[in-house]
Amino acid sequence: MFKLIRLEWKKNNVGKYIRNVVIMSALICLFIFALCYLGIANDPDTGVPDAAPGNSAISSSIELFTSMAFLVFTSVMLSTYIVSAYKNKTMNLMFSYPIKRQKILVSQMLAVWIFNFVALVLTKLLIYGCILLGSQFMVSSFPLDYNMASMGFYIQLLLKSVVIVTMSFIALFIGMAMKSSKATIISSFLLIFLTQANVGDFSLADNAILPVVLMVLSLIFAFLSIYNVETKDLN
């Protein structure tokens, strides 16, 4: 299986995705740093940070922007690796190999999932680390509500990253059903609106039950994406 995953990375030129992730992560890090220490979120009259409900601490902003960016980025990769292959018929050639269709499709999904999970975790660690380092020299506009010396911090970071990247399988299912890369990407934006919305002072992102529900739904949609691929007509 890992050989197939490596083949997918090589075939789709994973280097360009690494470059794009590095640029995206750097931009998010700079934005969060400016948000925290350069006062770009402060009210010009009062000097008080004007944050959205549920985002009064810096970790909420970090999770919000990294989740949005990587949910869309993962969906874009899935649309390139899988949905576009269905659309332009190159999947026909791949399915002519003496390998089960399900195994090929799973390897493509895992290639995207592993890449984005690792990238998301590293991006979060970079941002949290930079914000913590900045606190040694500057005063933050937002409370630093995390402790990088705590094991709980890393467990929570990993779990949230798993949920976000896995959610992209919902967008993949929609894109495959419609045979449309655009549908995959648009679905990822809709997922962002649904999961990161604020209702009054209540933030859906902070709901303890929501990640579990999303994880179960994502796995169901991932299963549905590969369930009947052995007999599915590609035309």
Language-model region placement:
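Aromatic- and glycine-rich beta-strand/loop motifs that create alpha-glucan
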Residues: M1-S25
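Hydrophobic alpha-helical transmembrane segments of multi-pass membrane transport/permease proteins
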Residues: K16-A41, S61-M77, V118, T184-V199, ...
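Membrane-helix interface segments
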Residues: Y17-I18, K100-R101, L105-V106, S180-I185, ...
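Secretory targeting signals
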Residues: C29-V76, S107-L172
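Transmembrane alpha-helical segments in integral membrane proteins
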Residues: F70-K87, V162-A183, F221
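Helix-loop-helix units of permease transmembrane domains in multi-pass membrane transporters
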Residues: Y81-W113
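Membrane-interface helix caps and helix-loop-helix hairpins in membrane proteins
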Residues: G200-A208
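Membrane-interface capping segments at transmembrane-helix boundaries
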Residues: I226-N235
